[in-house]
Each structure stands twice: as C-alpha cells, then as structure tokens.
Amino acid sequence: MLTGKLVTFEGPDGAGKTSALNAIVAKLQPQLGDRLVVTREPGGNQISEAIRKIILDRHNTAMDDRTEALLYAAARRQHIVQTIQPALQNDQLVLCDRYIDSSVAYQGAGRGIGEQAVYDMNQFATAGLTADLTLYFDVDAAVGLNRIQQHRQNEINRLDVEALSFHHRVQAAYLRLLADHPDRIKRVDASQPLDQVVTQALEIMASQLPTYVASKGGEDQ
C-alpha cells in the first residue's frame, strides 16, 4: 500500500524549479528528516542515471524522437520500481524533479510525437502511478532560455539548445496540462525572485499536504 505522497516539480527550461526544489528541501529537511526523499528524472538510481547520460549527451544528435521518448519512459519505470515506490510504501514524502508531464510537454508537444501517445506510453511505464501534487513553475520560454545562457553555460544539454519555437510548444503543452488537471497541478509564478517562488510553493504544499508540510514551510516547527 502506497501511504506516502509524491510531489513533482515541473516547468520549462530556465524556470528555476531545481533551485526552488533545493531551497524547499533545506526548509523541510529539519521538519521531516528521513521522511523526505528527493530525486530527479531522468535519474534517481544507477540504471536511470545511465540512461540520463545517453538522453542528454549533446553529441547524440542522431537520436530519433521516439527513441528519446522511450528512453525517458524506461528510465521512469526503473525509477519508480527502485526509488519512488519503496519510498511511498514507507510513508515518505517524495519530491521529484520532473515526471510524466515533462515527457508529455517535451516529447509529445516539443518533438511533435503527440501528447496523447506519450501519455499512453507513460501510463504503461508507470502502471498508472500519478503524482499527488505537481508544482508547475511558470516562466516565459524566452526568459527561461535567457536565464540558461546567463547562469548555466556549463550545464547546457541537448534539449536546452533546441530552437525557441520548440520551447514555446513545451510551454503551451504545460499550460494545457495545467488547465486539464487543476486539482493536481498548481501554478507557481517563477518570474518572481527565488525567495518569493519558494514561499508560494511552500504555501501550496502546506495547503495540499498538511500531514507533511506545516504552514509557513515548517518554519514554525
């Protein structure tokens, strides 16, 4: 029985979701201790991290779009079996940097494979394991890419170098997901300074998951 909770962090490149995640972890760790599990996709264990290197390697320019989508799904399956599911069975709070919505947005819309096709593929890969809460860090695609150029030159990967039109398609898909799943996906204004982004995200988490996240991000604990 899965008694824990899965919170996923989503957003276009340069939205700052990973920085926000790290700041949130710093606030929640004293409160939750071992009940908090932090992971990422693709990755989260040895096999999935190996797949991550293949996917994001800038030299793998010959990779077919469907191959890319299948690799993400394969990494996700291993991640669930080896990392996420055991944590949820242990009543832990799992914070995951990207999940299914990323595949729908990036491969389904960005690559043009089809959002429904990618969703269906991932339903098979995940056996229907859905996030309890998704924080969508929203920022304009052009702003996000500019942030990457300014602050992440040494970390630019194969998807970061796609044309702006690709990233606009990704952002549009995220907004459709937000509209289609309002109970699960909550928008965070990622154009704000980081401390305000973190505050807004923690307020959402506290309202949705009070068993794990105290009001004011656990600062009163």
From Swiss-Prot:
Organism lineage string: Bacteria, Bacillati, Bacillota, Bacilli, Lactobacillales
Role description: Phosphorylation of dTMP to form dTDP in both de novo and salvage pathways of dTTP synthesis.
Parts of the chain that traverse the membrane: none
The keyword GTP-binding belongs to this UniProt entry's keyword annotation: no
Family: Belongs to the thymidylate kinase family.
GO molecular function per UniProt: ATP binding; dTMP kinase activity
GO biological process: dTDP biosynthetic process; dTTP biosynthetic process; dUDP biosynthetic process
Known catalytic reactions: dTMP + ATP = dTDP + ADP
PANTHER family hit by this protein: THYMIDYLATE KINASE, UMP-CMP KINASE 2, MITOCHONDRIAL
UniProt name for this protein: Thymidylate kinase
